Protein backbone atom coordinates (compact mmCIF):
# COMPACT_ATOMS: atom_id res chain seq x y z
CA UNK A 1 0.00 0.00 0.00
CA UNK A 2 1.17 3.59 -0.64
CA UNK A 3 2.44 5.91 2.12
CA UNK A 4 -1.00 7.42 2.60
CA UNK A 5 -2.42 3.90 3.31
CA UNK A 6 -5.78 4.52 1.65
CA UNK A 7 -6.38 7.86 3.36
CA UNK A 8 -7.77 10.70 1.22
CA UNK A 9 -5.04 13.22 0.31
CA UNK A 10 -6.47 14.63 -2.92
CA UNK A 11 -8.23 17.43 -1.02
CA UNK A 12 -7.42 18.91 2.39
CA UNK A 13 -9.66 18.45 5.40
CA UNK A 14 -11.86 21.29 6.65
CA UNK A 15 -10.74 23.98 9.11
CA UNK A 16 -12.81 22.52 11.92
CA UNK A 17 -12.66 23.23 15.62
CA UNK A 18 -13.86 20.62 18.10
CA UNK A 19 -14.78 21.91 21.54
CA UNK A 20 -14.28 18.55 23.26
CA UNK A 21 -10.52 18.98 22.71
CA UNK A 22 -10.41 21.95 25.10
CA UNK A 23 -8.35 21.17 28.23
CA UNK A 24 -10.89 23.05 30.37
CA UNK A 25 -13.73 20.91 29.00
CA UNK A 26 -11.77 17.68 29.53
CA UNK A 27 -10.82 18.72 33.06
CA UNK A 28 -14.48 19.47 33.80
CA UNK A 29 -15.43 15.91 32.87
CA UNK A 30 -12.73 14.62 35.20
CA UNK A 31 -14.08 16.73 38.06
CA UNK A 32 -17.63 15.51 37.44
CA UNK A 33 -16.33 11.96 37.90
CA UNK A 34 -14.60 12.97 41.17
CA UNK A 35 -11.09 12.64 39.74
CA UNK A 36 -8.09 14.94 40.05
CA UNK A 37 -7.17 16.80 36.83
CA UNK A 38 -3.93 18.42 35.63
CA UNK A 39 -3.47 22.00 36.88
CA UNK A 40 -4.29 24.07 33.79
CA UNK A 41 -2.84 27.28 35.21
CA UNK A 42 0.63 25.70 35.30
CA UNK A 43 2.75 24.20 32.53
CA UNK A 44 1.34 21.11 30.84
CA UNK A 45 1.99 19.15 27.65
CA UNK A 46 -0.73 18.47 25.09
CA UNK A 47 -0.66 16.37 21.92
CA UNK A 48 -3.14 16.03 19.07
CA UNK A 49 -2.75 13.03 16.79
CA UNK A 50 -3.89 13.55 13.19
CA UNK A 51 -4.44 17.28 13.63
CA UNK A 52 -5.58 17.95 10.06
CA UNK A 53 -4.81 21.55 9.19
CA UNK A 54 -3.93 22.27 12.80
CA UNK A 55 -6.67 24.79 13.48
CA UNK A 56 -7.80 23.33 16.81
CA UNK A 57 -4.22 22.88 18.03
CA UNK A 58 -3.21 26.41 17.01
CA UNK A 59 -6.28 27.94 18.62
CA UNK A 60 -5.85 26.03 21.89
CA UNK A 61 -2.13 26.84 22.03
CA UNK A 62 -3.04 30.54 21.99
CA UNK A 63 -5.49 29.98 24.88
CA UNK A 64 -2.87 28.24 27.05
CA UNK A 65 0.43 30.06 26.34
CA UNK A 66 2.09 28.52 29.42
CA UNK A 67 1.66 25.00 27.97
CA UNK A 68 3.39 23.19 25.11
CA UNK A 69 1.34 21.78 22.22
CA UNK A 70 2.49 19.10 19.77
CA UNK A 71 0.63 17.66 16.79
CA UNK A 72 1.17 15.42 13.79
CA UNK A 73 -0.53 14.79 10.48
CA UNK A 74 1.07 12.75 7.75
CA UNK A 75 -0.36 15.02 5.03
CA UNK A 76 2.43 17.59 4.39
CA UNK A 77 -0.06 20.10 2.97
CA UNK A 78 -1.92 20.11 6.28
CA UNK A 79 1.28 20.72 8.25
CA UNK A 80 2.41 23.55 5.96
CA UNK A 81 -0.89 25.32 6.65
CA UNK A 82 -0.71 24.62 10.39
CA UNK A 83 2.84 25.98 10.68
CA UNK A 84 2.00 29.01 8.56
CA UNK A 85 -0.90 29.95 10.83
CA UNK A 86 1.31 29.53 13.91
CA UNK A 87 4.04 31.71 12.37
CA UNK A 88 1.55 34.38 11.30
CA UNK A 89 0.07 34.50 14.81
CA UNK A 90 3.50 34.36 16.46
CA UNK A 91 2.49 31.29 18.47
CA UNK A 92 5.73 29.90 19.91
CA UNK A 93 4.36 27.06 22.04
CA UNK A 94 3.03 24.84 19.24
CA UNK A 95 5.01 22.27 17.24
CA UNK A 96 3.78 20.46 14.10
CA UNK A 97 5.21 17.34 12.44
CA UNK A 98 4.34 15.71 9.09
CA UNK A 99 5.01 12.26 10.55
CA UNK A 100 3.04 9.06 10.45
CA UNK A 101 2.01 7.66 13.82
CA UNK A 102 4.93 5.20 13.68
CA UNK A 103 7.40 7.99 12.87
CA UNK A 104 6.04 10.48 15.39
CA UNK A 105 6.96 8.28 18.35
CA UNK A 106 10.65 8.65 17.42
CA UNK A 107 10.61 12.44 17.73
CA UNK A 108 12.07 14.11 20.82
CA UNK A 109 8.73 14.53 22.58
CA UNK A 110 7.84 15.10 26.24
CA UNK A 111 5.43 13.02 28.29
CA UNK A 112 1.91 14.34 27.79
CA UNK A 113 -0.84 15.33 30.20
CA UNK A 114 -3.34 15.19 27.31
CA UNK A 115 -3.37 13.15 24.11
CA UNK A 116 -6.38 13.75 21.87
CA UNK A 117 -7.55 12.29 18.56
CA UNK A 118 -10.79 13.26 16.86
CA UNK A 119 -12.42 10.79 14.46
CA UNK A 120 -9.21 9.43 12.93
CA UNK A 121 -9.49 6.08 14.72
CA UNK A 122 -12.35 5.14 12.39
CA UNK A 123 -10.46 5.99 9.20
CA UNK A 124 -7.18 4.12 9.51
CA UNK A 125 -5.76 0.61 9.19
CA UNK A 126 -5.39 -1.81 12.11
CA UNK A 127 -1.62 -1.25 11.85
CA UNK A 128 -2.07 2.48 12.37
CA UNK A 129 -4.47 1.91 15.26
CA UNK A 130 -1.77 -0.23 16.85
CA UNK A 131 0.77 2.56 16.23
CA UNK A 132 -1.54 4.97 18.08
CA UNK A 133 -1.83 2.57 21.01
CA UNK A 134 1.97 2.21 21.09
CA UNK A 135 2.38 6.00 21.02
CA UNK A 136 -0.06 6.50 23.88
CA UNK A 137 1.54 3.74 25.94
CA UNK A 138 4.95 5.41 25.67
CA UNK A 139 3.94 9.08 25.78
CA UNK A 140 1.00 9.59 28.14
CA UNK A 141 1.84 10.52 31.72
CA UNK A 142 0.57 8.48 34.63
CA UNK A 143 -2.63 10.34 35.49
CA UNK A 144 -2.85 11.71 31.94
CA UNK A 145 -6.06 11.96 29.92
CA UNK A 146 -6.75 10.58 26.42
CA UNK A 147 -9.68 11.85 24.36
CA UNK A 148 -10.76 9.63 21.48
CA UNK A 149 -13.84 9.93 19.27
CA UNK A 150 -14.96 7.36 16.73
CA UNK A 151 -17.88 6.04 14.69
CA UNK A 152 -19.91 3.67 16.81
CA UNK A 153 -22.15 0.65 16.50
CA UNK A 154 -25.05 0.03 16.60
CA UNK A 155 -25.80 3.58 15.41
CA UNK A 156 -23.96 3.09 12.11
CA UNK A 157 -25.40 -0.37 11.44
CA UNK A 158 -28.05 0.78 8.95
CA UNK A 159 -25.97 3.45 7.18
CA UNK A 160 -22.64 1.65 7.00
CA UNK A 161 -23.53 -0.14 3.73
CA UNK A 162 -24.46 3.24 2.19
CA UNK A 163 -20.90 4.44 2.84
CA UNK A 164 -19.58 1.24 1.28
CA UNK A 165 -21.81 1.78 -1.77
CA UNK A 166 -20.57 5.33 -2.35
CA UNK A 167 -16.94 4.33 -1.83
CA UNK A 168 -17.25 1.51 -4.36
CA UNK A 169 -19.00 3.78 -6.85
CA UNK A 170 -16.10 6.22 -6.57
CA UNK A 171 -13.51 3.49 -7.14
CA UNK A 172 -14.83 2.99 -10.67
CA UNK A 173 -13.94 6.53 -11.73
CA UNK A 174 -10.66 8.35 -12.34
CA UNK A 175 -12.29 11.77 -12.03
CA UNK A 176 -11.24 14.22 -9.28
CA UNK A 177 -12.61 13.24 -5.90
CA UNK A 178 -15.06 16.15 -5.57
CA UNK A 179 -16.65 15.12 -8.86
CA UNK A 180 -16.78 11.50 -7.69
CA UNK A 181 -18.53 12.58 -4.51
CA UNK A 182 -21.25 14.45 -6.42
CA UNK A 183 -21.84 11.52 -8.74
CA UNK A 184 -21.82 9.01 -5.88
CA UNK A 185 -24.46 11.07 -4.05
CA UNK A 186 -26.56 11.29 -7.22
CA UNK A 187 -26.21 7.56 -7.86
CA UNK A 188 -27.22 6.73 -4.28
CA UNK A 189 -30.22 9.05 -4.49
CA UNK A 190 -31.31 7.38 -7.74
CA UNK A 191 -31.22 4.00 -5.98
CA UNK A 192 -33.36 5.42 -3.19
CA UNK A 193 -35.86 6.80 -5.70
CA UNK A 194 -35.84 3.45 -7.53
CA UNK A 195 -36.98 1.90 -4.24
CA UNK A 196 -34.04 -0.46 -3.76
CA UNK A 197 -34.98 -2.79 -0.90
CA UNK A 198 -32.03 -1.62 1.17
CA UNK A 199 -33.53 1.87 1.28
CA UNK A 200 -37.20 0.90 1.61
CA UNK A 201 -36.37 -1.43 4.51
CA UNK A 202 -34.22 1.23 6.21
CA UNK A 203 -36.36 4.40 6.07
CA UNK A 204 -33.94 6.32 8.32
CA UNK A 205 -31.54 6.48 5.35
CA UNK A 206 -33.55 9.02 3.37
CA UNK A 207 -33.12 11.92 5.84
CA UNK A 208 -29.53 10.84 6.36
CA UNK A 209 -28.82 11.07 2.63
CA UNK A 210 -30.52 14.48 2.50
CA UNK A 211 -28.23 15.66 5.28
CA UNK A 212 -25.18 14.32 3.45
CA UNK A 213 -26.09 16.33 0.36
CA UNK A 214 -25.97 19.53 2.45
CA UNK A 215 -22.54 18.87 3.95
CA UNK A 216 -19.15 20.26 3.00
CA UNK A 217 -17.69 18.10 0.21
CA UNK A 218 -14.19 18.27 1.69
CA UNK A 219 -15.61 16.82 4.91
CA UNK A 220 -17.40 14.07 2.97
CA UNK A 221 -14.18 13.20 1.14
CA UNK A 222 -12.55 12.28 4.44
CA UNK A 223 -15.63 10.95 6.26
CA UNK A 224 -16.99 8.72 3.49
CA UNK A 225 -14.29 8.08 0.90
CA UNK A 226 -11.35 6.63 2.82
CA UNK A 227 -10.49 3.06 1.85
CA UNK A 228 -10.31 2.27 5.55
CA UNK A 229 -13.60 2.98 7.27
CA UNK A 230 -14.68 1.40 10.52
CA UNK A 231 -17.34 1.64 13.19
CA UNK A 232 -16.75 0.03 16.57
CA UNK A 233 -18.58 -1.27 19.58
CA UNK A 234 -17.29 0.46 22.69
CA UNK A 235 -15.75 -2.70 24.15
CA UNK A 236 -13.63 -3.18 21.01
CA UNK A 237 -11.98 0.22 21.44
CA UNK A 238 -11.63 -0.21 25.20
CA UNK A 239 -9.87 -3.55 24.69
CA UNK A 240 -7.39 -2.05 22.19
CA UNK A 241 -6.59 0.81 24.57
CA UNK A 242 -6.05 -1.53 27.53
CA UNK A 243 -2.65 -2.27 25.99
CA UNK A 244 -1.71 1.36 26.72
CA UNK A 245 -2.79 0.89 30.36
CA UNK A 246 -5.84 3.09 29.83
CA UNK A 247 -9.11 2.83 31.72
CA UNK A 248 -12.39 4.37 30.62
CA UNK A 249 -13.19 7.49 32.63
CA UNK A 250 -16.33 8.85 30.99
CA UNK A 251 -17.73 10.88 28.14
CA UNK A 252 -16.55 14.27 26.88
CA UNK A 253 -20.13 14.85 25.69
CA UNK A 254 -21.54 16.30 28.90
CA UNK A 255 -25.20 15.57 28.12
CA UNK A 256 -24.26 11.91 28.61
CA UNK A 257 -23.93 12.58 32.35
CA UNK A 258 -27.64 13.35 32.75
CA UNK A 259 -29.63 10.13 32.40
CA UNK A 260 -32.93 11.97 32.84
CA UNK A 261 -32.70 13.46 29.32
CA UNK A 262 -31.20 10.35 27.71
CA UNK A 263 -32.91 7.26 29.05
CA UNK A 264 -36.41 6.24 30.08
CA UNK A 265 -36.99 5.01 33.62
CA UNK A 266 -37.20 1.45 32.34
CA UNK A 267 -33.92 1.83 30.46
CA UNK A 268 -32.21 3.29 33.53
CA UNK A 269 -33.47 0.39 35.64
CA UNK A 270 -32.27 -2.25 33.19
CA UNK A 271 -28.93 -0.51 32.73
CA UNK A 272 -28.38 -0.35 36.49
CA UNK A 273 -28.64 -4.14 36.61
CA UNK A 274 -25.67 -4.57 34.25
CA UNK A 275 -22.75 -5.05 36.62
CA UNK A 276 -19.85 -5.07 34.13
CA UNK A 277 -18.97 -1.40 33.39
CA UNK A 278 -17.68 -2.08 29.87
CA UNK A 279 -20.72 -4.08 28.84
CA UNK A 280 -22.92 -1.41 30.46
CA UNK A 281 -21.53 1.14 27.99
CA UNK A 282 -22.31 -1.21 25.09
CA UNK A 283 -25.87 -1.71 26.35
CA UNK A 284 -26.28 2.04 26.77
CA UNK A 285 -25.23 2.52 23.14
CA UNK A 286 -28.00 0.12 22.11
CA UNK A 287 -30.56 2.10 24.11
CA UNK A 288 -29.38 5.34 22.46
CA UNK A 289 -28.47 3.84 19.06
CA UNK A 290 -25.17 5.72 19.43
CA UNK A 291 -23.35 6.44 16.18
CA UNK A 292 -20.48 8.58 17.50
CA UNK A 293 -18.72 8.36 20.85
CA UNK A 294 -16.52 10.99 22.49
CA UNK A 295 -14.65 9.04 25.14
CA UNK A 296 -12.10 9.99 27.78
CA UNK A 297 -9.65 7.37 29.01
CA UNK A 298 -7.10 7.87 31.77
CA UNK A 299 -3.85 6.20 32.73
CA UNK A 300 -4.42 5.78 36.43
CA UNK A 301 -7.19 7.45 38.42
CA UNK A 302 -6.60 9.67 41.43
CA UNK A 303 -9.97 9.89 43.14
CA UNK A 304 -10.93 12.98 45.11
CA UNK A 305 -12.11 12.57 48.67
CA UNK A 306 -15.76 13.59 49.20
CA UNK A 307 -14.83 16.97 50.69
CA UNK A 308 -12.23 17.57 47.97
CA UNK A 309 -14.86 16.79 45.34
CA UNK A 310 -17.36 19.21 46.87
CA UNK A 311 -14.70 21.92 46.96
CA UNK A 312 -13.67 21.23 43.35
CA UNK A 313 -17.31 21.44 42.22
CA UNK A 314 -17.85 24.67 44.13
CA UNK A 315 -14.78 26.21 42.47
CA UNK A 316 -15.96 25.39 38.93
CA UNK A 317 -16.39 28.69 37.12
CA UNK A 318 -18.84 29.06 34.21
CA UNK A 319 -19.43 31.75 31.60
CA UNK A 320 -22.22 32.32 29.10
CA UNK A 321 -20.92 31.83 25.56
CA UNK A 322 -24.10 32.81 23.68
CA UNK A 323 -26.31 35.92 23.91
CA UNK A 324 -28.93 35.38 26.60
CA UNK A 325 -31.81 36.10 24.18
CA UNK A 326 -30.74 33.17 21.97
CA UNK A 327 -31.15 30.63 24.77
CA UNK A 328 -34.06 28.26 24.14
CA UNK A 329 -35.52 26.22 26.96
CA UNK A 330 -37.21 23.73 24.64
CA UNK A 331 -34.49 21.26 23.65
CA UNK A 332 -34.27 18.00 21.73
CA UNK A 333 -32.50 15.21 23.62
CA UNK A 334 -32.14 11.47 22.92
CA UNK A 335 -35.21 10.85 25.09
CA UNK A 336 -37.23 13.37 23.08
CA UNK A 337 -38.20 17.02 23.37
CA UNK A 338 -37.71 18.43 26.87
CA UNK A 339 -38.82 21.80 28.26
CA UNK A 340 -36.12 22.95 30.68
CA UNK A 341 -37.52 24.52 33.85
CA UNK A 342 -37.67 28.27 33.39
CA UNK A 343 -37.61 28.90 37.15
CA UNK A 344 -34.20 27.18 37.29
CA UNK A 345 -32.53 28.02 33.98
CA UNK A 346 -33.61 31.63 33.50
CA UNK A 347 -32.21 32.90 36.85
CA UNK A 348 -28.90 31.11 36.18
CA UNK A 349 -28.62 32.76 32.76
CA UNK A 350 -29.45 36.18 34.22
CA UNK A 351 -26.82 35.76 36.93
CA UNK A 352 -24.16 34.70 34.41
CA UNK A 353 -25.04 37.54 32.04
CA UNK A 354 -23.09 39.90 34.29
CA UNK A 355 -19.96 37.75 34.09
CA UNK A 356 -18.55 34.33 35.00
CA UNK A 357 -19.43 32.83 38.37
CA UNK A 358 -18.35 29.74 40.24
CA UNK A 359 -20.93 27.19 41.28
CA UNK A 360 -20.39 28.34 44.86
CA UNK A 361 -20.97 31.98 43.90
CA UNK A 362 -24.08 31.06 41.94
CA UNK A 363 -25.47 29.30 44.99
CA UNK A 364 -25.20 32.59 46.94
CA UNK A 365 -26.43 34.88 44.14
CA UNK A 366 -29.73 36.65 44.84
CA UNK A 367 -31.06 35.74 41.38
CA UNK A 368 -30.76 32.00 42.07
CA UNK A 369 -32.17 32.09 45.59
CA UNK A 370 -34.24 28.99 46.30
CA UNK A 371 -32.59 26.82 43.64
CA UNK A 372 -30.95 23.76 45.20
CA UNK A 373 -27.25 23.04 44.68
CA UNK A 374 -28.11 19.83 42.83
CA UNK A 375 -30.43 21.71 40.44
CA UNK A 376 -27.75 24.35 39.80
CA UNK A 377 -25.19 21.64 39.14
CA UNK A 378 -27.40 19.67 36.73
CA UNK A 379 -28.51 22.82 34.89
CA UNK A 380 -24.91 23.93 34.33
CA UNK A 381 -23.93 20.50 33.01
CA UNK A 382 -26.87 20.52 30.59
CA UNK A 383 -26.23 24.11 29.47
CA UNK A 384 -22.55 23.35 28.93
CA UNK A 385 -23.47 20.21 27.00
CA UNK A 386 -25.84 22.20 24.79
CA UNK A 387 -23.20 24.90 24.25
CA UNK A 388 -24.76 27.77 26.20
CA UNK A 389 -22.11 27.87 28.94
CA UNK A 390 -18.49 26.79 29.25
CA UNK A 391 -15.94 26.42 32.05
CA UNK A 392 -14.00 29.66 32.54
CA UNK A 393 -10.83 30.96 34.19
CA UNK A 394 -10.56 33.85 36.63
CA UNK A 395 -9.83 37.41 35.53
CA UNK A 396 -6.13 37.24 36.42
CA UNK A 397 -5.56 34.21 34.19
CA UNK A 398 -7.69 35.74 31.43
CA UNK A 399 -5.43 38.81 31.34
CA UNK A 400 -2.31 36.63 31.17
CA UNK A 401 -3.67 34.91 28.05
CA UNK A 402 -5.12 37.94 26.28
CA UNK A 403 -1.99 38.79 24.28
CA UNK A 404 -1.62 35.34 22.71
CA UNK A 405 -5.31 34.96 21.83
CA UNK A 406 -5.37 38.49 20.37
CA UNK A 407 -2.47 37.56 18.09
CA UNK A 408 -4.17 34.36 16.95
CA UNK A 409 -7.48 36.11 16.37
CA UNK A 410 -5.77 38.87 14.40
CA UNK A 411 -4.27 36.28 12.05
CA UNK A 412 -7.65 34.60 11.56
CA UNK A 413 -9.54 37.86 11.03
CA UNK A 414 -6.99 38.97 8.44
CA UNK A 415 -7.60 35.68 6.62
CA UNK A 416 -11.33 36.51 6.59
CA UNK A 417 -10.54 39.22 4.03
CA UNK A 418 -10.10 36.41 1.53
CA UNK A 419 -11.81 33.30 2.88
CA UNK A 420 -14.63 32.03 5.10
CA UNK A 421 -12.82 28.79 6.06
CA UNK A 422 -11.75 29.80 9.58
CA UNK A 423 -14.94 30.25 11.57
CA UNK A 424 -13.73 30.20 15.20
CA UNK A 425 -11.85 32.72 17.32
CA UNK A 426 -9.99 32.05 20.57
CA UNK A 427 -11.39 33.13 23.93
CA UNK A 428 -8.87 33.59 26.75
CA UNK A 429 -11.74 33.51 29.25
CA UNK A 430 -13.11 30.06 28.40
CA UNK A 431 -9.99 28.56 26.83
CA UNK A 432 -11.71 27.36 23.70
CA UNK A 433 -12.96 28.42 20.27
CA UNK A 434 -16.08 30.52 19.80
CA UNK A 435 -17.93 30.39 16.48
CA UNK A 436 -17.55 33.73 14.67
CA UNK A 437 -18.50 33.70 10.99
CA UNK A 438 -16.81 35.63 8.20
CA UNK A 439 -19.22 38.57 8.20
CA UNK A 440 -18.77 38.97 11.95
CA UNK A 441 -14.99 38.77 11.63
CA UNK A 442 -15.05 41.46 8.95
CA UNK A 443 -17.19 43.66 11.19
CA UNK A 444 -14.62 43.21 13.96
CA UNK A 445 -11.87 44.20 11.52
CA UNK A 446 -13.83 47.30 10.50
CA UNK A 447 -14.21 48.24 14.17
CA UNK A 448 -10.46 47.85 14.76
CA UNK A 449 -9.69 49.96 11.69
CA UNK A 450 -12.30 52.55 12.68
CA UNK A 451 -14.20 52.11 9.42
CA UNK A 452 -17.92 51.90 8.70
CA UNK A 453 -18.80 48.22 9.15
CA UNK A 454 -21.34 47.60 6.37
CA UNK A 455 -19.34 49.65 3.86
CA UNK A 456 -16.10 47.84 4.76
CA UNK A 457 -17.71 44.40 4.43
CA UNK A 458 -19.30 45.32 1.10
CA UNK A 459 -15.98 46.57 -0.28
CA UNK A 460 -14.35 43.25 0.60
CA UNK A 461 -17.16 41.11 -0.83
CA UNK A 462 -17.73 43.14 -3.99
CA UNK A 463 -14.00 43.21 -4.80
CA UNK A 464 -14.17 39.40 -4.91
CA UNK A 465 -17.32 39.30 -7.03
CA UNK A 466 -19.44 38.09 -4.12
CA UNK A 467 -22.97 39.10 -3.15
CA UNK A 468 -25.17 38.36 -0.17
CA UNK A 469 -27.59 35.46 -0.50
CA UNK A 470 -30.69 36.09 1.61
CA UNK A 471 -33.30 33.35 2.03
CA UNK A 472 -31.96 31.59 -1.06
CA UNK A 473 -32.07 34.72 -3.22
CA UNK A 474 -29.00 36.66 -4.38
CA UNK A 475 -29.14 40.38 -3.59
CA UNK A 476 -28.10 41.94 -6.89
CA UNK A 477 -27.68 45.67 -6.27
CA UNK A 478 -25.20 47.48 -4.05
CA UNK A 479 -28.09 49.17 -2.23
CA UNK A 480 -29.72 45.82 -1.40
CA UNK A 481 -26.45 44.36 -0.14
CA UNK A 482 -25.66 47.41 1.98
CA UNK A 483 -29.15 47.47 3.46
CA UNK A 484 -28.82 43.82 4.48
CA UNK A 485 -25.33 44.39 5.88
CA UNK A 486 -26.60 47.34 7.94
CA UNK A 487 -29.19 45.05 9.54
CA UNK A 488 -26.51 42.41 10.17
CA UNK A 489 -24.21 45.01 11.75
CA UNK A 490 -27.01 46.40 13.92
CA UNK A 491 -27.87 42.95 15.27
CA UNK A 492 -24.19 42.12 15.73
CA UNK A 493 -23.49 45.31 17.67
CA UNK A 494 -26.54 44.77 19.87
CA UNK A 495 -26.11 41.10 20.78
CA UNK A 496 -22.92 39.44 19.66
CA UNK A 497 -20.36 42.22 20.11
CA UNK A 498 -21.02 42.71 23.86
CA UNK A 499 -20.74 38.94 24.34
CA UNK A 500 -17.49 38.68 22.36
CA UNK A 501 -16.10 41.56 24.41
CA UNK A 502 -16.87 39.70 27.65
CA UNK A 503 -15.20 36.60 26.21
CA UNK A 504 -12.05 38.59 25.44
CA UNK A 505 -12.44 38.26 21.68
CA UNK A 506 -13.21 41.80 20.46
Swiss-Prot record:
CDD domains: AdoMet_MTases (cd02440)
Protein name: Uncharacterized protein sll1526
Lineage of the organism: Bacteria, Bacillati, Cyanobacteriota, Cyanophyceae, Synechococcales
Pfam family, one: MethyTransf_Reg
SUPFAM superfamilies, alphabetized: S-adenosyl-L-methionine-dependent methyltransferases
Originating organism: Synechocystis sp. (strain ATCC 27184 / PCC 6803 / Kazusa)
Gene3D superfamilies listed in its UniProt record: Vaccinia Virus protein VP39
Family assignment from sequence similarity: To R.prowazekii RP789, RP027 and RP028.
InterPro entries noted in UniProt: Methyltranfer_dom, MeTrfase_reg_dom_prd, SAM-dependent_MTases_sf
Disulfide-bonded cysteines: none
